[in-house]
């Protein structure tokens, strides 16, 4: 077998002059070769083990001119050209049955006088394939994100399996090409068999992504009605805590009673719905968080009755205020206000079809079916008409539904799905100020910790990584980092 790092002697760049645990200083005698070098060029250094090559990144180039850099421990009076190389890994000609394997670790460090060669041209192309574990001749199964800046003929690949098996992060300042990178990845993912991905498009900037394998969905706006491509997320999909974060004013002195009565009414009306559907056998197993439809109008009527209730006194014919009389007034007002808010049409629409027992199935089919049987694998969800004050709640609602369905599914029936979280700092914040933000964080932190067990991968996308939750970032293994200022 011929390795990719077989060089002729006239290709020699230099030899190792000094070495420590992570860097090596290379002596370069040929001035022409020194002039052809650039910072960030890749080099290979001869290893003491047969079939292994140490890979390094050029971090500094110094010409013989008496330049002094005591901080770098270089000889004050240089009589030869040197380059400083940061060691980044080891290339193996063969490992088991695999050929051209790159490992991000050092089995050895260079020895003095070890030969150093530049990685360029065809060797750079082959090495980039090795880095992303692309089998030669099978480039179409991997994801291309661009070309190596120092040699534009060398393609930069990402191994799709490795990218999505672990949570990923794509960061870069505005204008650095972050959105282009995301779009490029999605265009290639969409072409793959059985692809399944969701993109949370917060500002509608990915509407131009078109093709037979893309589905564009939009969270309903104020004037939207039930139709293909329009998403309605009815209130009964919210968990108890999510509903309280939206409706309850925790500074109210009556907040504990309001929360208790709300929970009682939710359970009651969910059971009433099941009873009306002839599904009494399910009543014993439902919880506050079970996605069972119920009528908000009927629940408000019941709460209003409790708020105005008068009960008999001990003296015949006399009445007094009931135990909850006047305590639910502000809570009911908040419910009514949300109910009438046109901006929340996607949640509080009075469309009767949103109270169907099988609406959850229809929603999950829109969100989660992979690219099979004519279905489109990449779903782009436009949140541009969702009010910013409840955006974290609505985005996390969809993420939670996806995670919960994956969790409930039998192992053999699960299909892996990737969730691309664009503008993640808006709904996965490092610091929270509102209970709505807390509810969102609970969902995404759980997915970051447990999602891989159930086939749910996160791709966190942000131009402000310092404002993204640290727990979510710490659970990510793959990083694509562009120019950053935040």
Q: Where on the chain are the PLM-derived regions?
A:
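P-loop NTPase motor domains
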Residues: 207-208, 214-217, 235-443
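Substrate-engagement module of ASCE P-loop NTPases
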Residues: 188-191, 402-407, 440-458
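Conserved ATP-driven motor cores of ASCE-family P-loop NTPases powering translocation/secretion/packaging/pilus
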Residues: 249, 445-450, 454-486
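Glycine-rich phosphate-binding loop of nucleotide-binding enzymes
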Residues: 140-222, 470
């Amino acid at each position: 077998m011929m390795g990719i790092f077989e060089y002729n002697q006239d290709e020699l760049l230099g030899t190792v002059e000094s070495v420590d645990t992570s860097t090596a200083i290379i002596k370069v005698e040929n001035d022409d070769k020194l002039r052809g070098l650039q910072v960030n060029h890749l080099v290979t250094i001869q290893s003491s083990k047969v079939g292994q090559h140490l890979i390094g990144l050029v971090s500094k180039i110094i010409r013989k001119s008496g330049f002094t850099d005591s901080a770098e421990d270089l000889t004050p009076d240089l009589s030869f050209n040197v380059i400083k190389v940061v060691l980044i890994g080891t290339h193996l000609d063969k490992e088991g049955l695999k050929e051209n394997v790159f490992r991000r670790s050092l089995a050895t460090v260079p020895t003095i006088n070890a030969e150093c060669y530049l990685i360029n041209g065809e060797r750079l192309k082959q090495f980039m394939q090795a880095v992303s574990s692309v089998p030669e001749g099978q480039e179409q199964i991997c994801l291309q994100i661009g070309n190596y800046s120092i040699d534009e003929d060398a393609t930069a690949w990402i191994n799709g399996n490795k990218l999505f098996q672990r949570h990923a992060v794509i960061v870069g300042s505005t204008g650095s090409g972050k959105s282009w990178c995301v779009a490029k990845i999605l265009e290639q993912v969409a072409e793959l068999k059985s692809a399944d991905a969701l993109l949370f498009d917060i500002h509608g900037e990915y509407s131009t992504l078109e093709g037979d394998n893309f589905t564009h969905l939009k969270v309903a706006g104020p004037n939207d009605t039930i139709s293909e491509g329009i998403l309605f997320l009815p209130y009964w999909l919210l968990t108890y805590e999510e509903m309280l974060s939206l409706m309850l004013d925790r500074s109210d002195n009556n907040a504990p009673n309001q929360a208790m009565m709300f929970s009682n009414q939710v359970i009651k009306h969910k059971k009433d719905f099941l009873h009306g559907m002839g599904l009494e056998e399910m009543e014993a197993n439902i919880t506050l968080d079970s996605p069972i439809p119920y009528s908000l109008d009927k629940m408000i009527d019941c709460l209003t009755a409790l708020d105005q209730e008068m009960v008999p006194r001990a003296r015949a014919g006399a009445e007094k205020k009931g135990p909850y009389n006047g305590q639910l007034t502000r809570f009911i007002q908040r419910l009514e206000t949300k109910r009438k808010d046109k901006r929340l049409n996607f949640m509080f629409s009075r469309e009767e079809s949103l109270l169907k027992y099988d609406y959850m199935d229809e929603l999950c089919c829109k969100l989660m079916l992979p690219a099979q049987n004519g279905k489109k694998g990449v779903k782009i969800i436009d949140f541009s008409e969702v009010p910013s004050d409840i955006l974290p709640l609505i985005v996390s609602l969809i993420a939670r539904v996806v995670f919960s369905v994956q969790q409930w599914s039998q192992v053999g029936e699960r299909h892996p799905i990737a969730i691309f979280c664009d503008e993640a700092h808006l709904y996965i914040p490092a610091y929270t100020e509102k209970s709505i933000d807390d509810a969102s964080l609970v969902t995404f932190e759980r997915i970051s910790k447990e999602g891989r067990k159930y086939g749910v991968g996160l791709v966190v996308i942000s131009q402000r990584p310092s404002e993204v939750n640290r727990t979510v970032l710490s659970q990510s293994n793959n990083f694509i980092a562009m120019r950053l200022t935040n």
